[in-house]
Amino acid sequence: MASLLKSLSLFKKTREQPPLASGSGGAIRGIKHVIIVLIPGDSSIVTRSRLLDRLVRMVGDPEVSGPKLTGVLISILSLFVESPGQLIQRIIDDPDISIKLVEVIPSINSTCGLTFASRGASLDAEADEFFGTMDEGSKDHNQMGWLENKDIIDIEVNDAEQFNILLASILAQIWILLAKAVTAPDTAADSEMRRWIKYTQQRRVIGEFRMNKIWLDIVRNRIAEDLSLRRFMVALILDIKRSPGNKPRIAEMICDIDNYIVEAGLASFILTIKFGIETMYPALGLHEFSGELTTIESLMVLYQQMGETAPYMVILENSVQNKFSAGSYPLLWSYAMGVGVELENSMGGLNFGRSYFDPAYFRLGQEMVRRSAGKVSSTFAAEFGITKEEAQLVSEIVSRTTEDRTTRATGPKQSQITFLHSERNEAPNQRLPPITMKSEFQGGDKYSNQLIDDRLSGYTSDVQSSEWDESRQITQLTQEGDHDNDQQSMDGLAKMRQLTKILNQSDTNGEVSPAHNDRDLLS
């Protein structure tokens, strides 16, 4: 039996492993298309600032083709380094595109103010055509409209510090778009705005350089549809992380934004580990979880073997990403979501509407948290040297805080409805005889003798109306502050007792009792 379990574990691990790369054949290359990437031909801030201005306007041009837009965005993303050309050549390894670097320098003869660097030949006309600037009269039209602040005509500056903060403001907006451009582009606007406000408050960006919605939508859509652009952005992030020593301020900002980008699309896998396994509740010992726990274990090993690109597998469209979806471990995922909802308020907005969601195991996770509140793990207690008295003290404190949190979350509990009872020294023969009541409404409820007898047990039929009114007043004083439902129940009980008294008197006198309508009595 032990060998069977060992073979099963090895089988599942082998099943989850991707095919290993072999040296028998060469790498498969696709049909490449050429991407033109513009880089500054000198170290002048004027050249970079003017190039940035022209590139930003090109992004918002609807006539720019997809490959050209990709090259423009790569140019903007690499402008913050000292040698953009060397950076691009070092990190680009894409089987779908071929990068062609073109240097630009200032020009007084071209309309756009830039030209392509060449040996003797004048390429001013080609530069104007590439940038889409045909004449000086279209300058205002081309330069305005892509910033929310309409008063800004252009973004050309001469100072290096001003250029860095301006470039950081534009780069921050592009990198923020990568976080949800693939996983949730339709609902990304709110989170993107929150992160923009964060960097504005930290003085990393300038709020006046916020791009308008049209410009941001164009960039987001291009990031979502172009895998080569995403490969470049991920490669740039990894290159920044690997670089030693102090990093430029823009590079540090990119690493900070990466905290929102990393593990995008892997929320189910990460949250299952966090709430399902790391909490170490005894429910993990269920037989139903044994197979899925082995699956999670093999996926964690696979995640480690993928290396530094593992957190970006969804952004990079790696085919192995499907193995990490919650459909591979539905019961454990449902249980983990129940645990997470009880432990963290932020989990309440998570979307659970999936076909493999199991409500039973979701409730299991919730109940596991509720019933384990205040309990101290014996393993952790022994590791941290916690005594039995200290563990008991912790349990008491946690129980009280949990009750306070539940009260604040659910609101005050409604008081129970209290009914009047007769004095205990009353004779037992004064109980009401069984009475049958039938509603005259079609399809109305029919109350049996036993039901009426149970609800009116202990009440006498000769209670005077004045005594009943006095009892009602006392009850109202004791129940002051309760909800209106309590008062309605008391009124209904009073009218039911009046009906009982009338029926009892009719039976005693031997007269035919008149027909009473329930609607009149209970109105």
Curated annotation (Swiss-Prot):
Binding-site residues, RNA: K180, R195, Q202, Y260, N351
Organism this protein belongs to: Phocine distemper virus
Region ranges (Interaction with the phosphoprotein): 477-503
Protein family according to the UniProt entry: Belongs to the paramyxoviruses nucleocapsid family.
Keywords for the protein's UniProt record, in alphabetical order: Capsid protein, Helical capsid protein, Host cytoplasm, Ribonucleoprotein, RNA-binding, Viral nucleoprotein, Virion
Subunit structure: Homomultimer; forms the nucleocapsid. Binds to viral genomic RNA. N0 interacts (via Ncore) with the phosphoprotein (via N-terminus); this interaction allows P to chaperon N0 to avoid N polymerization before encapsidation. Interacts as N-RNA template with the phosphoprotein (via C-terminus); this interaction positions the polymerase on the template. Interacts with the phosphoprotein; this interaction leads to the formation of membraneless organelles that function as viral replication factories.
Region called Ncore, residue ranges: 1-403
Xref: InterPro entries: Paramyx_ncap
Region described as RNA packaging and organization of the helical nucleocapsid: spans on this chain: 1-375
Region called Homomultimerization, residue ranges: 1-36, 373-391
Function: Forms the helical nucleocapsid (NC) in a ratio of 1 N per 6 ribonucleotides, protecting the genome from nucleases. The nucleocapsid (NC) has a helical structure with either 12.35 or 11.64 N per turn, approximately 20 nm in diameter, with a hollow central cavity approximately 5 nm in diameter. The encapsidated genomic RNA serves as template for transcription and replication; encapsidation by N is coupled to RNA synthesis. Forms the encapsidation complex with the phosphoprotein protein P. Before encapsidation, the newly synthesized free N protein, so-called N0, is chaperoned by P.
Region described as Ntail: spans on this chain: 404-523
Classification via Pfam families: Paramyxo_ncap
Name assigned to this protein: Nucleoprotein
Segments passing through the bilayer: none
UniProt domain comment: Ncore is globular and carries regions required for N self-assembly and RNA-binding. Ntail is an intrinsically disordered monomeric domain in the C-terminus.
Gene Ontology MF term list: RNA binding; structural molecule activity
Location(s), subcellular: Virion; Host cytoplasm
Region annotated Disordered, chain positions: 423-442, 500-523
Feature: compositional bias, Polar residues: 501-511
Gene Ontology CC terms, in alphabetical order: helical viral capsid; host cell cytoplasm; ribonucleoprotein complex; viral nucleocapsid
